[in-house]
Structures are given as C-alpha cells and as structure tokens.
Amino acid sequence: MESTLGSDLARLVRVWRALIDHRLKPLELTQTHWVTLYNINRLPPEQSQIQLAKAIGIEQPSLVRTLDQLEEKGLITRHTCANDRRAKRIKLTEQSSPIIEQVDGVICSTRKEILGGISSDEIAVLSGLIDKLEKNIIQLQTK
C-alpha cells in the first residue's frame, strides 16, 4: 500500500492553519494577511519582497497584492532599497504592533494546545524527521 505521508502532512498544515484562522477572525485578517505579518515579524528587519516571498513559499506577484492590502490597512510600509531601486523593503508600522502581539499569542497558545499530551522527546523526534524529509527534498530538487 502506498504511503500517504505527504497528504497527511499537507492535511495537518491545512487544519492547523484553519484553526488559527478561526481564532484570528475577530482581527479581520485573512490567512494570507496573518501569515505574511507573522513572517515579516520573525524575519530580520526590512526584508525585501523577494526574501519574504521565499520565506512564505509563494511567488512574488502573489505577495504584492497582500502587501498592498496590508499597506492600505496601515500595518506595513514599503520603500525602495538604496542599493537596488527595483527592490522594495518592507517594514511593520507601529499600528501593527498590537495586532502582531495578538497573532503571535494566538499562534503560540494554539501550538501549545495542539501539542498537549505529546512529550518534548516525541516533538524532538518529529522535528528531526521533518528536517530529514526537507533535506531529502532539497537534495532531490538540486539534481
């Protein structure tokens, strides 16, 4: 019988994000918005749009629309990079700070609840296996 591990992992990510999405409804952020804000916040300051798109795992044109919406909401600013006038740097605004705090809080508390009843050793084993799978995939992509 063929392994369904890939489908199982994809489903896990989908339901995990859906739960966070549901809990963040009061903030009126779409999943795309909160994932983007979360990644901007955890990356080094003033990342380029290209670097952010890579971190999120989406194409840059898809990201631009989301950034336009976040800029309209006053949550980010974008400015031209001094070294490369074609590149745009992204910065969180002060207005985004309380929202980022809430998003981060929901993500952390949800993670804690989801992982409840699973030992730290089990989590470490799972993380190690996921790392190995990712390395295998990256190696296969470079062949």
UniProtKB/Swiss-Prot annotation:
Residues 49-72 bind DNA. GO terms for biological process: positive regulation of DNA-templated transcription; response to stress. GO terms for molecular function: DNA-binding transcription activator activity; DNA-binding transcription repressor activity; transcription cis-regulatory region binding. GO terms for cellular component: protein-DNA complex. It holds the Pfam family MarR. It comes from the Bacteria. Residues 2-135 form the HTH marR-type domain. NCBIfam families: PRK03573.1. Transcription regulator that can specifically activate or repress expression of target genes. Homodimer. This is Transcriptional regulator SlyA. The lineage of its organism: Bacteria, Pseudomonadati, Pseudomonadota, Gammaproteobacteria, Enterobacterales.
